[in-house]
């Protein structure tokens, strides 16, 4: 288990869903589970259907040399640990799609990730996630929590710290700024000063984010029981301008 569900359990909260990270490739996950489909080209994921629930399964990501690429795609981001996006991303059929020759890690001219399907190990994966409190892994084999970035301590202290350089991470995915505002509102987290400064400096990057992802994040901000706090957080961070 990975991400928000582990964070919430450590904080004594009830997770709304559970996400899985694995070294199995998406195509391997699909072969294991009958009720499974692969989605997304920007971030290829497996959705395993268990009754009315959807279990999101992401393969460990790794850093790779980026290539400059094409127009942005509006798929969901596996770093989130927040369950499937509300709007339906493009379904990907691994049995018929031809992805041979495609770059696995593509950035646009502003540093935004357009495609990220470079797979690696759990040690690689942790550094691809956004905030330290979301980079927690629960190993069901020995019931241990893997924490390489002091995310548990940051979560208990209600501090929202970014993994890596905030400017670089926001350029990779501007929607992370909205996620920071949401976590501050939802969990009463205090945003780390360097992170907050970067949000004020680079809020204009949100104009380049895919509309579908902005829509999904807006729904999470205002329709999850903390709408007033979300509005205050967005206004304080200059994200409504």
Predicted regions, residues:
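Catalytic cores of the polymerase beta-like nucleotidyltransferase superfamily
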Residues: 1-241
């Amino acid at each position: 288990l990975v991400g928000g569900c582990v964070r919430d359990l450590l904080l004594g909260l009830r997770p709304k869903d559970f996400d899985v990270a694995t070294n199995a490739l998406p195509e391997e996950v699909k072969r294991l589970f009958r009720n499974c489909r692969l989605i997304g080209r920007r971030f290829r994921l497996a959705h395993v259907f268990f009754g009315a629930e959807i279990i999101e399964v992401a393969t460990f990501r790794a850093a790779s040399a980026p290539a400059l690429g094409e127009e942005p795609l509006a798929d969901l981001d596996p770093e989130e640990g927040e369950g499937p996006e509300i709007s339906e991303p493009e379904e990907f059929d691994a049995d018929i799609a031809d992805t041979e020759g495609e770059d696995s890690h593509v950035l646009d001219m502003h540093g935004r990730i357009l495609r990220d399907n470079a797979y690696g190990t759990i040690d690689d994966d942790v550094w691809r996630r956004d905030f330290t409190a979301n980079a927690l892994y629960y190993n069901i084999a020995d019931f241990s929590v893997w924490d390489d970035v002091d995310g548990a301590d940051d979560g208990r202290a209600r501090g929202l710290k970014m993994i890596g350089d905030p400017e670089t991470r926001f350029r990779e995915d501007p929607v992370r700024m909205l996620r920071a505002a949401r976590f501050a509102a939802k969990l009463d987290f205090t945003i780390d000063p360097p992170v907050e400064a970067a949000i004020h400096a680079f809020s204009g990057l949100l104009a380049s984010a895919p509309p579908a992802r902005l829509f999904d994040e807006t729904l999470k901000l205002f329709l999850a029981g903390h709408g007033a706090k979300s509005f205050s957080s967005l206004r304080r961070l200059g994200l409504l301008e």
